[in-house]
Amino acid sequence: MVIAVDNDGPRMTLAFSTLGCADLELSEALALAARHGLDAIEIRALGGTIDLATYFSERFGSPASLARTLEASAVRVCAFNTSLRLVGATSQAKEEFLRYLPWAEAAGVKSLRVFDGGNSGDAGEVAEALSTLQWWRETTDREGFSAEMIVETHDFLVQPDAIARLLEGAPDCALLWDTHHTWRKGGQDPVETWKQVRGNTRHLHVKDSISKPGPKLPYSYVPPGSGEFQ
């Protein structure tokens, strides 16, 4: 479940990530959300691929065509989820990230998710993350982009005190708070984490898990509300 914090509205926006239904086409994902009374979708994958820029180009031809399709839908898109990582952001990775911008700008998608990357949250990783954020500030100032980069607490930002160190250097950094990861992977109390991130959070990811090793992880995901996350 995805919760988008709508600072312009009276309520939170409820959505899901298409990562859980990656083979669906855009029309099918929008219909699924509508069928379950959700407000929006967060697009990570469509048609079996996470290369959304190529998917949109093949299916719609132009950003304007995608925009018309989304304008006709009662379900909106709250974010495009990219693969860029603040730590380890190569020139090629940045170029791939920028391919999302024409589609986001035309369709009025406000948020572009990136990962934090890294692992330890040490001074070197924080400095590299801040450098990538500065690159984005300079790029968006030059190009006049309206979409916002939101950083998911996925990797080094699950470490205790890492969020504070990042925000000290980038107090305007927009966050996607993965409530599960800072708790399960970082051992942090969600109440305390919220105190840190509430002023910067644009989206929340809500997941649940149990302490049973899975195929790839030391825990297993379960439907929200049926696991150990409280």
Residue ranges and their predicted role:
Residues 52-57, 91, 160, 164, ...:
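Gly/Pro-rich active-site loop or hairpin
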Residues 42-67, 118-121:
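Glycine-rich, proline-tolerant flexible connector loops at the mouths of alpha/beta enzymes
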Residues 12-18, 41-43, 77-82, 112-114, ...:
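Hydrophobic faces of well-ordered beta-strands that scaffold small-molecule active sites
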Residues 28, 34-35, 63-76, 86-177, ...:
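Active-site acidic/histidine proton-transfer and metal-coordination neighborhood
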